């Protein structure tokens, strides 16, 4: 099986997104050599090629689209593909993901829009009411992104789930990746998102935050086309952010959304 692990990086991204503020960019510049080393070392460990794409694209959202398009392009050359955001730190206990995830499926970690109990990232009903009253949503809010995906599905006469797939870590075999057809449908996905924003069951406080987004589109495509997927589990995409600041030893990949790399690299 011919395998590849890849990531994408630009240390001069436009500062027009909350993921590209001064602190986060400076952290990337400081830790880039170590991040690349660990990802490359992991690829070697699992018998895969490794490529770090140093893109010239400076728009954050465009880079997010670029990574999924590259994911599809590698499926034309390789039997199995693993994409890692460049803020994903490999723990030294990480197993071979190509052996742990069914490569007849897309392996992703789903975040759920709402549960009454469970994951502490899930917004409580009372908090949602408060957000609506105070107009506190933003376009990176998981609830808004899931609503956008479901609004797109409603225009196709389909009922969506409460899931949104985080694309910081994505793995799959070439045949199932080819079923995504993200790149060739990007223009029509943008058009459908625009329609979903304008013709929407959701309140304006939510729908005004519907924006072009790779996670919205990937989840939409998987659900619309019934593409087989595997919930890879939190250990493969252990998100470190304002809700979960400290790493745990049992995780394989730390997804440092907060860019506080010192917590995992020191």
Cite the ranges covered by each PLM segment.
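N-terminal anchoring/stem segment of glycosyltransferases
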Residues: 1-78, 257-262
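Conserved donor-nucleotide/metal-binding helix-loop-beta segment in metal-dependent transferases, i.e.
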Residues: 90-141
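Catalytic core and acceptor-binding pocket of nucleotide-sugar-dependent glycosyltransferases
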Residues: 143-265
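Long, low-complexity, intrinsically disordered polar/charged segments
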Residues: 1-34, 99-101, 164, 176, ...
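Short catalytic/ligand-binding loop motif for oxyanion handling, primarily in non-cytosolic enzymes
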Residues: 14-15, 58-60, 90-93, 98-99, ...
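A structural signal for short, well-ordered beta-strand segments and their strand-loop junctions
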Residues: 5-6, 51-53, 82-85, 107-109, ...
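Short, well-ordered alpha-helix to beta-strand connector turns
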Residues: 78, 86, 104, 250-251
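A conserved donor-nucleotide-binding helix/loop in the catalytic core
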Residues: 58-82, 91-98, 106-109, 165, ...
